[in-house]
Design a protein with these regions (language model features):
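Short glycine/threonine-rich turn/loop motifs
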Residues: 2-120, 188-274
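Proline-centered turn/helix-capping motifs that create local helix->coil transitions or kinks
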Residues: 182-188
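Periplasmic c-type cytochrome electron-transfer domains
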Residues: 68-156, 160-180
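Short secondary-structure boundary segments
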Residues: 29-35, 173-175, 182
Length: 274
């Protein structure tokens, strides 16, 4: 079979070939499922970002419990898929459509404060309402005493544990390597992806084709104005995002609203959130 010239057989052989991850990504894979990194020894990254649920939560709870089960997180847990192309935060992020003005965009966490996936991965570890590790030292100690300490040293140097900050940063880089290299984090396997890449199974129905036209129509729905689908924007392939932040809440209750019966002038009251 290895010498077969049948394209289908060759394609099957390629698909069956196991994915080879770099040493840092192998470390990241083990760390991703390591509950010992949490304060209670009961929670891993995968507890909230379950691979079986597209790296999202494995339950219907809107806000997940933390390692300290008396605590809950502050926001709904997002999927970790398709994060590898997200740029660092910028107050004036460029808009790919070339028309819309620049606006805040990029970064990780709800406010973009983590510039990279490596920086983002470190934040839940020390968050008291998430993994609740006591300190960087506690996390590094758990790695050093774990079953993959030797692999960690192979990936990041024999003396990596000599410096706590260096080892903690390396752990974030390992998880970033996993999320970048492991194709399950960005499979591009939906019907629309198959359609975009002209692959088997990617034939749209007439209704779906009409929906695509509507989605891209600037004069009607203009969904693509924010959900950009152009190829190779920051290295991504049609993620339907321009990575910017949008204000989708109710309009501000101020004097700019015509006939507002009870306006609250912006900035006049220190308790007013603008």
């Amino acid at each position: 079979a290895c010498n077969s010239t049948d394209p289908a057989a060759a394609q099957g052989a390629v698909a069956a070939r196991p994915q080879v991850l770099s040493l840092p990504a192998q470390v990241g894979q083990l760390a991703f499922f390591d509950k010992r990194l949490s304060g209670g020894g009961n929670m891993s990254c995968a507890s909230c970002h379950d691979p079986q649920y597209a790296y999202g939560p494995p339950n219907s709870i809107s806000v997940q419990l933390g390692s300290d089960i008396a605590q809950t997180g502050a926001r709904a847990v997002p999927s970790l898929r398709y994060r590898e192309s997200t740029p660092a935060y910028d107050d004036n992020a460029p808009n790919p459509d070339g028309v819309t003005s620049e606006s805040p965009g990029g970064g990780f966490m709800w406010d973009g404060r983590a510039a990279t996936m490596a920086a983002q991965a470190a934040l839940p570890l020390l968050n008291p309402v998430e993994m609740n590790a006591a300190s960087k030292e506690a996390v590094v100690k758990a790695v050093r005493e774990g079953g993959y300490a030797a692999l960690f040293q192979q990936a990041f140097g024999a003396r990596v544990f000599d410096d706590t900050d260096q080892a903690f940063d390396a752990l974030g880089k390992a998880i970033q390597a996993l999320e970048t290299e492991d194709l399950s984090f960005h499979p591009y396997s939906s019907k629309y992806d198959l359609y975009v890449f002209n692959k088997i199974g990617g034939v749209l129905t007439p209704a779906e084709r009409r929906g695509e036209v509507l989605f891209h129509s600037s004069g009607v729905a203009n969904c693509s104005g924010c959900h950009y689908t152009g190829a190779n924007f920051n290295g991504n392939t049609g993620l339907m995002s321009d990575f910017t932040y949008q204000a989708l809440a109710a309009p501000r209750n101020d004097r700019s609203i015509p006939h507002n019966p009870d306006p609250i002038p912006a900035h006049d009251d220190p308790t007013y959130f603008d």
